Design a protein with these regions (language model features):
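Mobile-element integrase/transposase regions
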Residues: 1-37, 45, 49-63, 67, ...
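A structural microfeature
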Residues: 39-40, 234
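Short, glycine/charged-enriched secondary-structure capping and boundary segments
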Residues: 23-25, 82-86, 116
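Generic short beta-strand
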Residues: 28, 41, 224-225
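Charged alpha-helix within mobile-element recombinases
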Residues: 89-173, 215, 219-220
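C-terminal, beta-rich DNA-binding module of retroviral/retroelements integrases
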Residues: 144, 148-258
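Acidic/histidine-rich, metal-coordinating catalytic segments
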Residues: 47, 59-83, 104-106, 111, ...
């Protein structure tokens, strides 16, 4: 449970609707879990990694960096075929020191407060379809302003989200991330094809980690642990050139809740 603003941000795409122009409209929503403050209600032209990363860069520059981001297991927030379910987007979050909190597959109630936000949007915005994307974005901006500034919440003691929310104390740097690992680690960069090279050995880890600096630490039986910032990705056996990934975050969440 979040105890302060920016402890947890929640993110999702609301279900799409068609504008009068025939354009598909699929809002990206980002919310501070503690204060209920809606950080973003944006209408990107596509739900791609690049579009969502651009929006998060804007949010981080404006509000700072949260401690945790909670999402479902869908693209571009996660990848079911990659180590730990990491996508390029969530690997970037990890490199920034943000912890990941994933809902269980097919359990939207795990992010229930965010789903209720989407119901409000469905009832109060989507029911009044605008002419085009620009007009619909303007309507979303007005709704977000009203929700944050003028809508009191019982859980906030009758206060509005804007009266509770404050920016993060963790600043965001626009400079490329330079991960530094501690004593006992060797740093290696994942190649564009997702492989890691070590003493003439090439081992595939994950394409989602392309360009990321990972830390290698000796483990038992001649194996090496592979870390991305604080996250243990798995182990590599360079004798067999094989990588064994850690259990996915979603599977681990399901196991713990069983």
């Amino acid at each position: 449970m979040p105890r302060a603003p920016n402890d947890v941000w929640t993110v999702d795409f609301k279900g799409w609707w068609l504008l009068r122009s025939g354009q598909r409209c699929e809002p990206l929503t980002v919310r501070d879990a503690f204060s209920r403050y809606v950080l973003a209600l944006r209408l990107p032209e596509a739900s791609t990694t690049a579009a969502v990363k651009t929006e998060f860069e804007r949010l981080f520059e404006l509000y700072g960096v949260p401690n945790v981001i909670k999402s479902d297991n869908g693209s571009p927030f996660a990848s079911s075929h990659a180590v730990l379910g990491l996508s390029r987007l969530s690997a970037w979050w990890v490199s920034l020191g943000i912890e990941l909190d994933r809902s269980r597959p097919a359990h939207p109630q795990d992010n229930g407060a965010h789903e209720r936000l989407h119901l409000d949007i469905e009832r109060e915005i989507a029911a009044h379809v605008a002419t085009d994307r620009a007009a619909q974005q303007a309507a979303c901006d007005l709704w977000r302003e009203e929700f944050n500034q003028h809508r009191p919440h019982e859980a906030l003691g009758g206060r509005c989200p804007a009266q509770v929310y404050q920016k993060s104390s963790r600043p965001y740097s626009t400079e490329p991330v330079q991960l530094v690992y501690g004593a006992g680690f060797f740093t290696r960069r994942i190649a564009a094809n997702g492989t890691l090279s070590w003493r003439r050995h090439n081992v595939f880890v994950s394409g989602a980690l392309a360009g990321c600096d990972v830390g290698l630490r000796r483990a038992e039986l001649g194996r090496f642990e592979v870390w991305l910032n604080y996250l243990l990705l798995g182990t590599i056996d360079f004798q067999t050139c094989s990588f064994l990934g850690s259990p996915s975050l979603a599977k681990e969440a399901a196991r713990l809740s069983a």
